[in-house]
Structures are given as structure tokens and as C-alpha cells.
């Protein structure tokens, strides 16, 4: 029984970490920020829909 407790204490002690938790900073989706601006033709309703629309 003593050996089981010793092994348990060592196993749980090995799981201890001093690393900080991950944290997010900044915008949620920062990809291509400032590189693409929609043109008036991009905002037209004729461009909306998938390849199956109107089939």
C-alpha cells in the first residue's frame, strides 16, 4: 500500500508544470489584415451564392 501511494505521489508530482496558460491577444482572425478591400462588384448580389445555385 505504501508503494502504491509513493508511486501515485511521484506520478502526480511529474504532472506539475510552471508554464503559463495560453492566452489570445489581438483580433480573432488577423489573416490578410489591410490587404483586401471589397470592390463594389464584390458586394453585388449577383456574386452571392455557390456553384450549385441556379442549376
Swiss-Prot record:
Task: Enumerate the Pfam families for this protein.
Answer: VirB7
Q: What does this protein do?
A: Is essential for the biogenesis of the T-pilus, which is required for virulence and T-DNA transfer to plant cells. When is associated with virB9, might function as a nucleation center for recruitment of VirB proteins during assembly of the T-DNA transfer machine.
- Keyword terms: Cell outer membrane, Crown gall tumor, Disulfide bond, Lipoprotein, Membrane, Palmitate, Plasmid, Signal, Virulence
Q: How does it assemble?
A: Homodimer and heterodimer of virB7 and virB9; disulfide-linked.
Q: What is its main location?
A: membrane
Lipidation sites of kind S-diacylglycerol cysteine? 15
What is any one GO biological process for this UniProt entry?
protein secretion by the type IV secretion system
Query: Which residue numbers carry lipidation of type N-palmitoyl cysteine?
Result: 15
Question: Record's Gene Ontology CC terms?
Answer: cell outer membrane; type IV secretion system complex
Kindly give the NCBIfam families that the UniProt entry links to this protein.
PRK13859.1
Protein name per Swiss-Prot or TrEMBL = Outer membrane lipoprotein virB7
How does the record classify its membrane topology?
Lipid-anchor
- The gene name on file is virB7
Q: Where in the cell is it found?
A: Cell outer membrane
Q: Which residues form the signal peptide?
A: 1-14
